[in-house]
């Protein structure tokens, strides 16, 4: 106050002179001085007031009088004011309220008071649905401050409508700024004009402009659109509000609006950008509206709508900023915007929330790279050059991988997911308009099932676990569709009536076991099953499987895609394709429990999107999922070292003598002669948690004896298994191998002549525990990376229990033998007929005695039988060899071949050949295998009425045509997906001589 009094006295003499006659000549100086005093005084706490010379003199005299009254009078006056506002007024108000309450008690509530309040409430909340007024928020709804409140009290507004008049702590509010008309194009762009004035450096030369204001905080934008289309049209408009200062689409898209483009009433889109915009010539290009329509029936070249915009913003300087209201900060900024709904129109709005996460921080690199200006350096008196200036480099980097393995039974149900927007938008605060006609509430809604784990639950299975359980026991086996036919869960009906489900099937298995025992269980999923298929873990786990030890992991979760060819599935798809589920025991109880128990399996529809898993044979993927069960490594509790070895030539099947087990990944890998790759293994502990061990893993040749003393001289990986550790993974780079190795090895090959690498597992120290039992590890080869394949493999009879991998496409001309059929020497009427299912690898004859057939378990034959879905070109070659005892002059044999796509007589022939060449001939043709599941076809499936290809033979003079051999070759475009559980395949391949007699295999 003393500072103010001093300045007033300082200016008093000048003011007295200005009011004199001579002061009229300097009236403009008076106004300027008064403005300085006004700005200085109100900058203390108040907002500017309307001033003039007379107003100032009166104010000054009153102020001087107040000062002269003295401190005692001032305090007395303030006490009187305090008594009036604190005591007198509340007492009178309480008296009036008490009188009103007494009247209500005596007379009751007036009859029309509730009706009036209801009418007022309806008008307040529904007026925007019936009136075409602007809905841009008021200034006090967005910004607050003492300066604005005092200005409002004094009758002066702190709001301006021109950028040129914008000053510190001012609010810019401009309505009806015209925009360019919206053209009728497939996609159009309309800049959002924030000011009608041209903003540039020249604007700041005027006296009215406040040069301190450099930016605007854009609080609200209302886009008003009047459509020229018919009021009864069905055109839907989609609008994207874009911030052009961002190049990343996740940051650029601020809001999405969808609304009908019918004429009549305007479309009003409100957005709250909450963004600081620099005042510069291109500020009107900062925000742009991208528009498109659902159909293009409006005439091209014509304008579809006229548009204008209303803007509310606040000036921001280096010394002052805005203060948002709690309503704006907690409600409007969170909702981001909305569409005004007129006459129950269907409207929809969603807004981007692209906030950084912990993962973004950990995976970001902040690199500082500063190069100084070149420096002129003198070399000599006649020469100088520019040399490089000083430089500065520094980088801040987080971890490249940040993975948290945390079991979770309940998914986060707080987010709302909108189809088509999951990848870009966090729709936690998406706003659906109120009313009966919501954007997504249609009777023809075909969207997928998306809910919480409880809401998306489709089934529950109880599996009895007996107390006497050994490895290989099948606990449950059957179609997966049977599990999902239970009608007592929330999403069961939705599952039965939804055409396309894009989420994976989420499985949660729970089993309580004692900690002093161990158990290995597996739940396996395969695309099909044929005949008396084997349920061995080698065959069942190759497609999708969860293998775990319940003693270490009480709750096991797994998600899989039942349609490996596509990103969607349905219940009818599971039923008609025969998708199969097997629950099997991998390792029995290591300690016998007292009673039987049971396991509970819950089935849910996951929010995780389905991803296809397709194997490309001759142009394979960089990362190949294998799921090849290598076997169990058992380490007993003893004082001596135990050695376990597993071959890495993984192209053959698994099984006993004269029969093998085969699955799709191994059949694919066996197509190559040699291979080399990075190997990744998963180690699963299957014994009691109290039995621990330290195991060393390394790769070496298989002929190392068990008593080798320097095993750990090889480069090895030392794994320490703790009490509760269930599993871990190890990997070996292909750089550790000198060269590639064979995918298949003959079963009679000695280890010293093998020449292929083996995976070794040896005990680093002894296994000991107070609990009885062995330390058991289940080993699975998860996948291969950066695979190199060399050559094509024709196959080996009964190749050793090994496996193979493939990569890098090649043109191959190597044929695989499939069938060898010998005709009967004494055919009835000289005729013999048979048919071959080319895709199912099956043979049907007319049943005559003397006919002999042999099926070769070659790589292509195994691939066709184990692959559920096939796509590509199959090349077939038929070779006939006649009996040499028949002379050329006496040759009278004739063969007729017909190619049909079904064994039903109602199907027409696709191709037909007649061959009568004596003694020997061959015929080659190709078939394009294509189907309804994104080009993939399933053999003999009732789903989409899928069939097969049949090659029918009718041989006249069968005694002369002794042997028919069928060979296959796959085209470079061949693809396969999904595994079929098969019975054990015979590997015996006796040869026939040209007289039809069986010969010993060489």
UniProtKB/Swiss-Prot annotation:
Residues 392-398 are annotated as: Involved in tubule formation by the movement protein. The lineage of its organism: Viruses, Riboviria, Orthornavirae, Pisuviricota, Pisoniviricetes. GO terms for cellular component: host cell plasmodesma; T=3 icosahedral viral capsid. It comes from Cowpea severe mosaic virus (strain DG) (CPSMV). This is RNA2 polyprotein. One of its GO terms (biological process) is transport of virus in host, cell to cell. InterPro entries: Como_LCP, RNA2_polyprotein, Viral_coat. Keywords: Capsid protein, DNA-binding, GTP-binding, Host cell junction, Host-virus interaction, Inhibition of host innate immune response by virus, Nucleotide-binding, RNA-binding, Suppressor of RNA silencing, T=3 icosahedral capsid protein, Transport, Viral immunoevasion, Viral movement protein, Virion. The record marks 433-434, 806-807, 985-986 as: Cleavage. GO terms for molecular function: DNA binding; GTP binding; RNA binding; structural molecule activity. Residues 46-68 are annotated as: Hydrophobic.
């Amino acid at each position: 106050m003393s500072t103010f009094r001093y300045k007033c006295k300082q200016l008093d003499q000048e003011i007295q002179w200005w009011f004199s006659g001579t002061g009229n000549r300097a009236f403009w100086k008076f106004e300027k001085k008064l403005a300085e005093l006004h700005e200085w005084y109100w900058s203390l706490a108040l907002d500017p007031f309307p001033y003039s010379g007379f107003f100032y003199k009166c104010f000054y005299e009153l102020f001087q009088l107040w000062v002269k009254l003295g401190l005692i009078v001032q305090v007395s006056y303030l006490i009187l004011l305090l008594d009036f506002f604190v005591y007198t007024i509340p007492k009178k108000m309480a008296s009036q309220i008490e009188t009103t309450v007494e009247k209500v008690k005596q007379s009751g509530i007036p009859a029309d008071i509730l009706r009036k309040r209801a009418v007022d409430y309806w008008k307040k909340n529904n007026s925007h649905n019936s009136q075409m007024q602007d809905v841009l928020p008021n200034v006090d709804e967005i910004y607050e401050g003492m300066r604005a409140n005092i200005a409002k009290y004094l009758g002066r507004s702190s709001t301006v409508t021109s950028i040129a008049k914008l000053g510190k702590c001012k609010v810019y509010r401009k309505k009806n700024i015209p925009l360019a008309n919206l053209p009728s194009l497939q996609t159009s762009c309309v800049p959002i004009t924030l000011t009608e004035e041209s903003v540039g450096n020249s604007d700041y030369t005027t006296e009215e402009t406040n040069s301190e204001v450099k930016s605007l905080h854009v609080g609200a934008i209302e886009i008003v659109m009047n459509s020229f289309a018919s009021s009864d049209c069905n055109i839907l408009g989609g609008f994207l509000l874009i911030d052009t200062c961002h190049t990343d689409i996740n940051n650029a898209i601020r809001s999405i609006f969808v609304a009908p483009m019918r004429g009549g009433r305007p479309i009003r889109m409100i957005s709250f950008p909450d963004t600081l915009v620099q005042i510069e010539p291109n500020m009107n290009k900062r925000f742009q509206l991208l528009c498109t329509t659902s159909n293009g029936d409006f005439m091209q070249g014509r304008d579809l709508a006229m548009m204008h915009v209303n803007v509310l913003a606040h000036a921001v300087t280096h010394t002052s900023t805005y203060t948002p209201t709690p309503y704006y900060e907690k409600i409007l900024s969170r909702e981001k915007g909305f569409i005004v709904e007129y006459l129950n129109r269907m409207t929809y709005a969603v807004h981007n929330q692209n906030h950084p996460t912990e993962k973004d921080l950990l995976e970001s690199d902040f690199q500082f790279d500063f190069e100084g200006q070149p420096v002129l350096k003198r070399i000599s008196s006649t020469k100088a050059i520019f040399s490089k200036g000083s430089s500065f480099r520094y980088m801040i980097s987080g971890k490249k991988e940040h993975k948290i393995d945390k079991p979770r039974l309940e998914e986060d149900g707080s987010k709302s997911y909108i189809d088509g927007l999951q990848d870009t938008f966090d729709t936690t605060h998406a706003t659906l308009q109120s009313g009966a006609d919501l954007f997504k509430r249609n009777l023809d809604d075909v969207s997928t099932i998306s809910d919480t784990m409880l809401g998306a639950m489709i089934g529950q299975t109880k599996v009895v676990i007996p107390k006497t359980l050994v490895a290989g026991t099948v606990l449950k086996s059957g179609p997966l569709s049977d599990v999902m036919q239970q009608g007592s869960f929330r999403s069961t009906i939705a599952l039965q009536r939804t055409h396309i489900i894009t989420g994976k099937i989420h499985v949660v298995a729970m089993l309580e076991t004692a900690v002093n025992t161990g158990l290995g269980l597996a739940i396996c999923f395969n695309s099909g099953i044929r005949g008396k298929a084997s349920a061995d873990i080698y065959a069942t786990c190759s497609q999708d499987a969860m293998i775990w030890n319940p003693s270490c992991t009480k709750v096991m979760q797994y998600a899989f895609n039942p349609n490996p060819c596509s990103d969607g599935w349905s219940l009818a798809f599971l039923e008609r394709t025969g998708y199969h589920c097997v629950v099997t025991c991998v390792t029995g109880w290591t300690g016998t429990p007292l009673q039987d128990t049971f396991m509970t399996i819950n089935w849910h529809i996951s929010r995780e999107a389905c991803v296809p898993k397709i194997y490309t044979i001759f142009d394979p993927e960089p990362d190949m999922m294998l799921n090849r069960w290598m076997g169990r490594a058992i380490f007993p509790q003893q004082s001596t070292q135990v050695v376990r070895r597993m071959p890495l030539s993984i192209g053959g099947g698994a099984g006993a003598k004269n029969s093998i087990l085969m699955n799709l990944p191994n059949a694919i890998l066996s197509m190559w002669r040699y291979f080399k790759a990075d190997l990744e293994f998963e180690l699963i502990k299957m014994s009691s948690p109290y039995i621990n061990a330290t195991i060393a893993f390394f790769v070496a040749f298989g002929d190392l004896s068990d008593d080798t003393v320097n095993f750990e001289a090889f480069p090895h990986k030392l794994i320490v298994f703790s009490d509760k550790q269930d599993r871990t993974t190890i990997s070996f780079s292909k750089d550790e191998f000198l060269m590639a190795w064979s995918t298949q090895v003959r079963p009679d090959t000695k280890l010293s002549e093998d020449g292929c690498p083996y995976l070794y597992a040896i005990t680093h120290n002894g296994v000991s525990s107070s609990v009885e039992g062995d330390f058991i590890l289940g080993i699975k080869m998860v996948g291969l990376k950066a695979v190199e394949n060399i050559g094509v493999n024709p196959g080996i009879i009964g190749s050793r229990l090994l496996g193979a991998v493939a990569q890098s496409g090649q043109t191959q001309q190597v044929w695989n033998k499939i069938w060898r059929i010998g005709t009967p020497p004494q055919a009835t009427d000289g005729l013999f007929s048979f048919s071959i299912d080319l895709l199912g690898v099956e043979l049907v004859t007319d049943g005559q005695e003397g006919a002999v057939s042999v099926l070769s378990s070659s790589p292509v034959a195994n691939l066709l039988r184990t692959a559920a879905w096939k796509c590509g070109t199959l090349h077939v070659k038929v070779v006939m060899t006649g009996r040499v005892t028949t002379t050329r002059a006496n040759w009278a044999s004739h063969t007729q071949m017909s190619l049909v796509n079904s064994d039903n007589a109602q199907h027409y022939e696709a191709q037909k050949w007649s061959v009568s060449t004596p003694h020997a001939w061959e015929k080659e043709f190709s078939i394009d295998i294509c189907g309804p599941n994104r080009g993939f076809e399933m053999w003999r499936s009732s789903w989409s009425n899928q069939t097969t290809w049949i090659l029918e033979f009718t041989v006249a003079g069968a005694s002369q045509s002794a042997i028919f051999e069928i060979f296959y070759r796959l085209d470079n475009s061949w693809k396969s997906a999904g595994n079929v559980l098969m019975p054990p395949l015979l590997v015996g391949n006796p040869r026939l001589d040209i007289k039809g007699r069986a010969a010993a295999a060489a």
